[in-house]
Amino acid sequence: MHIKKGDNVKVIAGKDKGKEGKVVATEPKKDRVVVEGVNVIKKHQKPTQLNPEGGILETEAAIHVSNVQLLDPKTNEPTRVGYKTVDGKKVRIAKKSGEEIKANN
């Protein structure tokens, strides 16, 4: 998967199209990512010993990785991800600017 935890992404399809956020979690086996403040759902929580009140909680749900695009670190625009070998290591690069994408977990 070309998107990692900590990346800044923009939603390019779906009900939250145009929103930007940071990737909180990735689910590589399902090809899904959880983005901060995007695809917020209301979840009904039963009362438990830890949370005696219960109630309705708002949480972010995962969206498909094809619906988000990485933001270029140089221009802050959506870009595709490429790979390049530097000093024997495979690094991610932004296709638009050629800038190396650092892993910022």
Curated annotation (Swiss-Prot):
Annotated GO CC locations: ribonucleoprotein complex; ribosome
Alphabetized GO MF terms: rRNA binding; structural constituent of ribosome
SUPFAM superfamilies: Translation proteins SH3-like domain
Keywords carried by this UniProt record: Ribonucleoprotein, Ribosomal protein, RNA-binding, rRNA-binding
GO terms classed as biological process: translation
Domain of life: Bacteria
InterPro entries listed in its UniProt record: KOW, Rib_uL2_dom2, Ribosomal_uL24, Ribosomal_uL24_CS, Ribosomal_uL24_KOW, Translation_prot_SH3-like_sf
SMART domains: KOW
Keyword Transcription regulation: no
A Pfam family it matches: ribosomal_L24
Similarity comment text for this entry: Belongs to the universal ribosomal protein uL24 family.
Assembly description: Part of the 50S ribosomal subunit.
Function: One of two assembly initiator proteins, it binds directly to the 5'-end of the 23S rRNA, where it nucleates assembly of the 50S subunit.
NCBIfam families recorded: rplX_bact
Listed name of the protein: Large ribosomal subunit protein uL24
